[in-house]
Amino acid sequence: MLKKLFALGLSIISSAQALELKGHLTQGGLVTGHIKNAKQVKLNDKPLAITPGGHFVFGFGRDETLTHTLSWQSADGSWQTQPLVITKRDYDIDKINGVEKKYVSPPKSVLTRTKKEAKAVKEARSTFSHREDFLSPLYRPATGRISGVYGSQRYFNGTPKRPHFGLDIANKTGTPVYAPVSGKVVFANNDLYYSGGTLILDHGYGVTTTYIHLHKLHVKEGQEVKLGDKIAEIGATGRVTGPHLDWRLNWGQVRLDPALLMQVQLASKQK
């Protein structure tokens, strides 16, 4: 058995068995890996898809447990096991009392609509393709002030609301939103109840990025986009209090923190 791997932040870890991991071994973190000539790779006994070049990807949710096991089968048929220990994160909690009930829970009249929309978004995030864009750096999609962070949560009248799973970038309506990495549009809708103008890009092997509260979409479903392409404009659509981009990162249905991977440079400057 190999030595346990720990990581507080961005890491490149390798061993004598040619295991290489890059990313963040922490709650909300995405990790890419590489093992030469591996026949199979598993995380906690669940198979991971492997690219022809031996790369794979996985991630850890907001409240994921801290101990995990990565295992792989070498070309000779033998299995290797690598324990992983991820770091626990503290999140911003905001408790607000005296809020009117209608703002705590949505009216019953919109439940059918919101369930249908949630199903469509879930299906888009379940997209699996063999693109390998996820191996490329993730650049900043828009200019503006960081107004909200991943993992934060509000309590209204003692009732916990869903945690925030994105990075909010506040700026005026019409501010360009650029593709932070190449991908394919798998979802584009101008008017979802909660998220308003919503766009989802597929980057391969279960990795997607989502763009919410958009004023205008400049791409459509099925369209290929390149790093730095203008894909949308910041807006205040859906249930929001002001114009901003809510930017999200997913590995399948696992919600991750895009801020951990975001390069400081604006995506449009990389074209």
Residue ranges and their predicted role:
Residues 197-202, 207, 223-270:
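Conserved, short, structured surface segments that act as functional micro-motifs
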Residues 180-218, 243, 248:
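Zn2+-dependent peptidoglycan hydrolase active-site motif and core
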Residues 26-28, 36, 65-67, 79, ...:
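Extracytoplasmic
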Residues 83-195:
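Surface-exposed, glycine-biased beta-strand/turn segments
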Residues 176-187, 219-234:
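Short, well-structured beta-strand-loop connectors
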Residues 1-11:
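Sec-dependent signal peptide recognition
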Residues 10-18:
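Hydrophobic h-region of N-terminal signal peptides that target proteins for export
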Residues 19-29, 34-89:
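Ser/Thr-rich low-complexity repeats and stalk/linker segments
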